[in-house]
Amino acid sequence: MGQADISRPVNPDGVEEIGQPTADLGMVMDCVEAGDITPPTKRKSKFSGFGKIFKPWKWRKKKSDKFKETSEVLERKISMRKPREELVKRGLLLEDSEQGGEDPGKLSHATLKNGHTTLIGSTRSSSPVQVEEESERIASLRKPVPEEEPKKRLGSSGSQPHSEAEFVPESIPKQPLLPPKRHLSSSHEANEGQAKDATSSGSLARPSSSASTTAITTAPAATMAATNPAKTVHSSGPPSQAPRTLPAAPASTHTTATLSLTHTGPAKQPPIPPPKPTHRNSNPVIAELSQAINSGTLLSKPSPPLPPKRGIPSALVPTSESAAATTATKAPSDQREKSACSVGSEPLLTPSSSPLPAHIPPEPPQSPPFPAKTFQVVPEIEFPPSLDLPQEIPQQESQKREVPKRMLDHSFGEPQVPPRLPPVPLHIRIQQALTSPLPVTPPLEGSHRAHSLLFENSDNFSEDSSTLGRTRSLPITIEMLKVPDDEEEEEQSHIFAFDEDVASTSVIPKLPQCLQEEEEGKESDSDSEGPIQYRDEEDEDESHHSALANKVKRKDTLAMKLNHKPSEPEMNMNSWPRKSKEEWNEIRHQIGNTLIRRLSQRPTPEELEQRNILQPKNEADRQAEKREIKRRLTRKLSQRPTVAELLARKILRFNEYVEVTDAHDYDRRADKPWTKLTPADKAAIRKELNEFKSSEMEVHEDSKHFTRYHRP
């Protein structure tokens, strides 16, 4: 991520100015674009590398003794560096004229280191200790590495998960490619030394001397020296092409690196941590392209693809040519045996795009020999940390040869299938995946190849199921999680898990008619003949299966149940339990009584009409009723007596009607003045009223003596 900030342009004289600041971004990008390569997809920012060197949030946690220890290691290493002339004499460096005469396109091409891009000649400040005595390097490696190194390494590699597929996680992405003369352990130790140097030289700002230009020239020398043997080796591997083609230089650099890593097996090796799964980042398009070329039969290995991501140029996916070259150099006789095993096609296990095949992680020694094709699913806990690579690689190849032979020979008497079959629809492939533990997948064309990545007919699932100690239902490997409890079970159960699958009796489900006709043309070349029995062990292990496998299993179980569904006459016969005629009559009588009782509680239509719930029959009847009511009313009104008749009958006693005058209405309740009167006001009103009565009201003579006011 931050190589562009630490790197410097190649100095053709080999003379390094000590006080020179770091090269700006433009010069580095111009060097990258000098050849006829596709430019990188995403340019790095100018300050992206500062986080690697200056981490003030980490400085709190560091202690001064770690700084002292690192500076002592640095001083000791810098004091023991060889001058440039001695390195040229020993043949580790080229002369300036030879270096200048090389192809500028090859020099300027960005090489792949630990999943990052760096220029071959631009990693100068990070490698002051690259060429030194191997004994001193071993001695410095045995010293305890300070704790700041893993933190820095986490900071650099944790941001790019696709770099984990390169199997050297100790190396920080700043070191150049190692010369091919070196042993494997020494290259690892040099990587660790460089990691120390790079981290502390950024923080301590140590001036470099002229011998640090050795790193610049060793990498092109290694590149050009190993191009010819790599090209001769290429012819033995099967020709294939990667998703994007590369110039010859990066391919040959990969080949030299892997050649040097493969052939030399020293006594001591640092432990190689297993690769983290690249499965979740895998680009299905690249996987399809590489699978179309490399896998001719059902036993050839699908490629673990490295998708171009973030700052990596897309041209950095390494060619399968170089990978094939490494496998060819590893064991040509192995290639012949493997090609004899496979059904008339390319060699069995040709990794199409894994960049360093020498770093295949070792299997646990107690596991039975199954082909170690996919290491994506196997979790980290499985690998013992102290196994040596050179002993493990032949063992693995013998395992890879054993099982496909065993599978092909003992396929339980089934006829061998020719490799080319017509493409099969997805639902039939799901059916086949469910009816056989190792499913049939004919060679795929077109859009079916994407589905084949899910329903893959690989042997890897036999390895996964054996090492993880569980039986197989579907080979859809969607990265199962490893629970710590599984480790205890796995030693007992993985020994007989494979035999149990082979020997299990099975029932062939009845397929629909359309599927049966297609099934007759195809015979399964796997080692079982029927569906998986849903046993009790699988019920216990249901949590381990992926969601997709469970979904497909549910759907297929439902389809099988629907296939076995009885016909309608059978259902009609068996739906009711048989009863005698008397029982049937009794049941009918009870039902009839209940219905009659409920019907009798309903209101009659007359009641409903009276309640105006039920309307009369029709509109004509309704109109007739209205006319009748009107006629009756008019007759009554016409028969009323007049006022004269009423006066004559002395019913009306007045000769005139009461006259009515208009008056404004007012609210009597609101107008209550007497409520607001004081007692004095009330007494005054009463006195006034009494005076009016005594003076103006007339009283009958006979009753005058009853009044107070009218005394005689």
Curated annotation (Swiss-Prot):
Residues 516-528 have a biased composition (Acidic residues). Keywords: Actin-binding, Cell projection, Cytoplasm, Developmental protein, Neurogenesis, Phosphoprotein, Repeat. It comes from the Eukaryota. RPEL repeats lie at residues 72-97, 593-618, 631-656. The keyword Cytoplasm applies. Residues 358-371 have a biased composition (Pro residues). Residues 114-124, 233-243 have a biased composition (Polar residues). It is found in: Cytoplasm; Cell projection, Lamellipodium. Residues 1-22, 90-405, 507-557, 602-626 are annotated as: Disordered. The modification Phosphothreonine is found at T441. GO terms for biological process: actin cytoskeleton organization; closure of optic fissure; enteric nervous system development; negative regulation of integrin-mediated signaling pathway; neural crest cell migration; neural tube closure; positive regulation of catalytic activity; regulation of cell cycle. Its main location: cytoplasm. Gene3D superfamilies: 6.10.140.1750, 6.10.140.2130. SMART domains: RPEL. GO terms for cellular component: cytoplasm; lamellipodium. Residues 136-152 have a biased composition (Basic and acidic residues). Binds PPP1CA and actin. Regulator of protein phosphatase 1 (PP1) required for neural tube and optic fissure closure, and enteric neural crest cell (ENCCs) migration during development. Acts as an activator of PP1 by interacting with PPP1CA and preventing phosphorylation of PPP1CA at 'Thr-320'. During neural tube closure, localizes to the ventral neural tube and activates PP1, leading to down-regulate cell proliferation within cranial neural tissue and the neural retina. Belongs to the phosphatase and actin regulator family. This is Phosphatase and actin regulator 4. The gene is PHACTR4.
